[in-house]
């Protein structure tokens, strides 16, 4: 009897470890943000084993004959479950996936859409230049095994270097590059002029502090100016829950104040090692991830502006 119990206990342990566990359940629920546009809005956290990367916003646009996807999410399993949820709304293939930038929480789901539909991937050339199949990007190291399984790195098929205008199934899309480093080395935002919907990627976030670890404050300010020039009623950030016309306000205020305060600190001859105690950005301390990200943003932006002033 004791031997049987021991074997049962061992089996229970083995089959509940991540490698044997059932596929991670993302519990994805699409939110309709505009006519023919649905988004899966992520939690206001960094990627972790508990959220399995579902801290990113991904969107489906329903056209007359297919779905167009704006960012595919952090894993094959996330993408598969998102498509299953959207199939309850319309039984359509995904023929085009648009990737806004190179951070892998936004595009590792491409492997599902390439495998299932041979979807055309449109996005940054940076991905092709810096990632190859077999590389273990951040999501491979953070997500649990039952969430990241089957995920592969897929090359981008079309890499625009200027504004790309697309009409797909009667819906118009403008894919607009910033043209310089902003959130990352190569960022795009997507604008639907007839729908007045703008997808910002990580050029803007709300409800949480942005991570500008690979970015440029000057480029972010340029991107915000470019996005503001568009006539939008719906604004979808790369992370954040506010998809209204005010969805860019957080990012605009944060980066504008940061720039103004850095200029003042340089004028006052503040040293690099004391800048984070001088520029605190306390107006945003109630935003998610403030403690984790704000000081680094301030420090790196200060260094950037200080050198640009020389």
Give the predicted meaning of each segment.
Residues 22, 229-231, 242-310:
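Accessory terminal helices/loops
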Residues 17-21:
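Sec/Tat signal peptide C-region and signal peptidase I cleavage site
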Residues 84-158, 163-165:
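Active-site HxH/HxHxD metal-binding segment of metal-dependent hydrolases
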Residues 35-85, 188-201:
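Conserved beta-strand hairpin/beta-sheet module of binuclear metal-dependent hydrolase folds
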């Amino acid at each position: 009897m004791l031997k049987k119990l021991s074997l049962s206990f061992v089996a229970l342990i083995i089959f509940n470890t991540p490698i044997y566990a059932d596929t991670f359940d993302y519990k994805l629920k699409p939110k309709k943000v505009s006519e023919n546009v649905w988004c899966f809005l992520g939690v206001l956290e960094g990627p972790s084993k508990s959220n399995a990367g579902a801290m990113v916003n991904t969107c489906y646009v329903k056209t007359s004959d297919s779905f167009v996807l704006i960012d595919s999410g952090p894993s094959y399993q996330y993408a598969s479950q998102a498509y299953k949820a959207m199939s309850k709304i319309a039984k359509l293939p995904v023929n085009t996936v648009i990737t806004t930038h190179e951070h892998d929480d936004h595009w590792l789901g491409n492997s599902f859409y390439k495998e299932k539909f041979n979807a055309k991937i449109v996005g940054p050339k940076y991905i092709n230049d810096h990632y190859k199949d077999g590389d273990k990007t951040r999501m491979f190291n953070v997500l649990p095994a039952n969430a990241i399984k089957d995920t592969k790195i897929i090359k981008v098929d079309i890499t625009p270097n200027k504004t790309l205008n697309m009409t797909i199934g009667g819906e118009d899309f403008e894919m607009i590059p910033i043209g310089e480093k902003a959130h990352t080395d190569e960022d795009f935002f997507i604008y639907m002029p007839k729908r007045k919907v703008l997808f910002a990627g990580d050029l803007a976030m709300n409800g949480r502090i942005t991570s500008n670890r690979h970015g440029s404050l000057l480029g972010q300010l340029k991107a915000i100016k470019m996005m503001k020039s568009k006539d939008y009623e719906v604004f979808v950030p790369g992370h954040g829950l506010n998809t209204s016309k005010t969805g860019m306000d957080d990012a605009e205020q944060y980066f504008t104040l940061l720039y103004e305060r850095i200029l003042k600190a340089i004028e006052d001859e503040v040293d690099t090692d004391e800048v984070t105690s001088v520029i605190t950005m306390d107006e945003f301390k109630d935003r998610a991830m403030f403690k984790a990200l704000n000081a680094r943003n301030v420090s790196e932006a200060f260094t950037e502006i200080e050198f640009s002033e020389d």
